[in-house]
Amino acid sequence: MAYRKRGVKREDLPQQNERLQEKEIENNTDVTMENKDKNKNKNNNRKQQLSDKVLSQKEEIITDVQDDIKIADEVKKSSKEESKQLLEILKTKEDHQKEVQYEILQKTIPTFEPKESILKKLEDIRPEQAKKQMKLFRIFEPRQLPIYRANGEKELRNRWYWKLKKDTLPDGDYDVREYFLNLYDQILIEMPDYLLLKDMAVENKNSRDAGKVVDSETASICDAIFQDEETEGVIRRFIADMRQQVQADRNIVNYPSILHPIDHAFNEYFLNHQLVEPLNNEIIFNYIPERIRNDVNYILNMDMNLPSTARYIRPNLLQDRLNLHDNFESLWDTITTSNYILARSVVPDLKEKELVSTEAQIQKMSQDLQLEALTIQSETQFLAGINSQAANDCFKTLIAAMLSQRTMSLDFVTTNYMSLISGMWLLTVIPNDMFLRESLVACELAIINTIVYPAFGMQRMHYRNGDPQTPFQIAEQQIQNFQVANWLHFINNNRFRQVVIDGVLNQTLNDNIRNGQVINQLMEALMQLSRQQFPTMPVDYKRSIQRGILLLSNRLGQLVDLTRLLSYNYETLMACITMNMQHVQTLTTEKLQLTSVTSLCMLIGNTTVIPSPQTLFHYYNVNVNFHSNYNERINDAVAIITAANRLNLYQKKMKSIVEDFLKRLQIFDVPRVPDDQMYRLRDRLRLLPVERRRLDIFNLILMNMEQIERASDKIAQGVIIAYRDMQLERDEMYGFVNIARNLDGYQQINLEELMRTGDYGQITNMLLNNQPVALVGALPFVTDSSVISLIAKLDATVFAQIVKLRKVDTLKPILYKINSDSNDFYLVANYDWIPTSTTKVYKQVPQPFDFRASMHMLTSNLTFTVYSDLLSFVSADTVEPINAIAFDNMRIMNEL
């Protein structure tokens, strides 16, 4: 590239390029010859590399001419900008290091999840009533079963019985009670908050006048029965007449339905205990938080009247039922983290147009500090890290941390006096509780030993670790100056005031902070400190401190405005919080750089920034949805725990119940929650009362367990064990089977009692005396219709092992079915062989399907509309932000 320095003209460039190319090829050839003599083994490789190099140089010379001129211009421009961007780059580096440290710290917390995923999960929690019910709730369905003759051959006729829709037992577990617990859990998930039959009604295909039935399953059942050849004519005529009956004056409609009596009881209960309530404008008006309704900065309007059919479901906003802030450090940390991330997303941004120009402010600060005449390194640090991004980050962090009650930790350099002076403002306006104790002590100690004690010529404070008093509390007793002691007294007593507003515990700020008057108190203390002689320190040290105080005191008006702005935004967003704001120090903390506090203090302008009404409504809706879902999931968990207790599954299922509860809250990483907190959560949950609807549903299941067992193809109601083989009996539902339909003449033992007492002696004695014994209780069975396996495997051995090991819960008898559908039926028939078994399965006949008994008329409202987002009816706007009014009827920002 040396030819450029000799002033090559643009038109001569192609010729120059050719000549240079030739020279370079010659030179490179010489080099290759030398290398060949030195290193013969690598000759080919070296040639290839050099030829590639020559080609690449040729391309660079041809194409790079004008690019280099452009790059030179860019270098000149960037050299001018580098000095401006240097502070921003340093800040970015600091931020990166901070994020890395934060991630490392968070990985030690069991329930941590990435920020974006938590925010998405919170916003995705929607009221369950938003999904419409398109079918009635059903456990049973009618099914056609064949009829077998006395010799085991299938007839052409069929018979209808009620069978289970989902006949599934828990995998790998032979306890039927788990089936009922899972069934109850499924009902709780599917239990509708309201039913509108008009939404699910479908056309009855066999109707004479296009009538409708209640849902698609009823229609398909009617269709199957209508087409069955054995159906009576009167039933077909009845199906043809099935249709809805409307009573428009009462807003009522009746629909015909085909339901098992138990399913009918469930759906009748759902219809009679709907959670929907009438909705009108007054309810929507009262739904908006009162402080936002009364805020003069927001204009709210409702332009439409709601119809009489409007309905809504009142959110379940009960408070502190589990007290997760008390002794649930890991869970509480996750809740506060998710609340913090949500709050940060709604705190308004301080954009560059709302802040003072960073460049102009740094220039002004340099003039105030007389930096051109400086010889002291410490004062150049005053300007480090000041930028608009840091100011905005600090503003959002402070408000979001207070809204979520997240503990903050302070990061600072002791030699940066400007940071410490900004920290004095921070400690003045933010209550002490918000900071990690160790971090607060370190910051206070730095302020005392760097600024306060040197000003009065006092010796350095030697603070003892673990001292119940903070450095400021010790200093308050030792400093004689009234203004400084008064300021220290305010900070030492700066706590949140707990106030219950609209039934929610709020953490409110001191009135002196809300109106900004405390800043005058801070300035008086700072002025007193700057007037002191610093007798034990050099003159340069005194000058540095005084100039730092001067920089802050020059912005007295802006600091008052900033404090008022901070308080207003905090209180306005706090009105949208629905869960009690419990204050407990969190396991992890939010890092706050004191340089970012300096940025905020120095760059705050006179523009008022308040949350938009849409942001407030969004924040309120997310909080309501999470809180309501939280309470509903508590109700579910309490109901399941009670059910497990009554089904004698209490010890077995407890941890999985609590895990399911946490999973349904969406924000927890359940596998990483410590076991001690799981069991503590179980203890809290079991102390709560069961919600009425959930208790009634469980009682319905409990009363009808026998009917459900009868309808299952996998659950037996007992087993009969004999020492000698018993013949298989004929049954018209199955053919030849080892089924007993009643227990007449058998000695009976309850399986529950057997499991509880563990006394197997009675069974053994009865079997040895050749007396069959019936073990009564629900247990699963398997079906095996192969005669070969029947010969090969005597099922008595199954029970011999169980009696030996004393494990009734592994009992799983085999049901043998031999009929014309079986593979080996003709083998049995031809040889006239009568199969036998040492066991019989006790099972009652499932309930026959009777059309007349299964036809029910269900009644619901003809029509209503459920609205889940009540705030969508409210149109909202803000007044001119510059005139925004605070609680004391004065402008938030007075400094113009």
From Swiss-Prot:
Q: How is it modified after translation?
A: Sumoylated with SUMO1 and SUMO2. Sumoylation of viral proteins seems to have a positive role on viral replication.
- Point to the regions of Basic and acidic residues compositional bias: 9-26
Gene Ontology CC terms, in alphabetical order:
T=2 icosahedral viral capsid; viral inner capsid; viral nucleocapsid
- This protein's UniProt keywords: Capsid protein, Inner capsid protein, Repeat, RNA-binding, T=2 icosahedral capsid protein, Ubl conjugation, Virion
Q: Which InterPro entries match?
A: Rotavirus_VP2
In this UniProt entry, which residues are annotated as the site Interaction with the intermediate capsid protein VP6?
Answer: F238, M242, M855, M857
Known role? Inner capsid protein that self-assembles to form an icosahedral capsid with a T=2 symmetry, which consists of 120 copies of VP2, with channels at each of its five-fold vertices. This capsid constitutes the innermost concentric layer of the viral mature particle. It encapsidates the polymerase VP1, the capping enzyme VP3 and the genomic dsRNA, thereby defining the core.
For this chain, the family text in UniProt reads:
Belongs to the rotavirus VP2 family.
Entry's free-text remark on domains: The N-terminus binds RNA. It is necessary for encapsidation of VP1 and VP3. The N-termini of 10 VP2 molecules form a cylindrical hub underneath each 5-fold axis of the inner capsid.
Q: What name does the UniProt record give this protein?
A: Inner capsid protein VP2
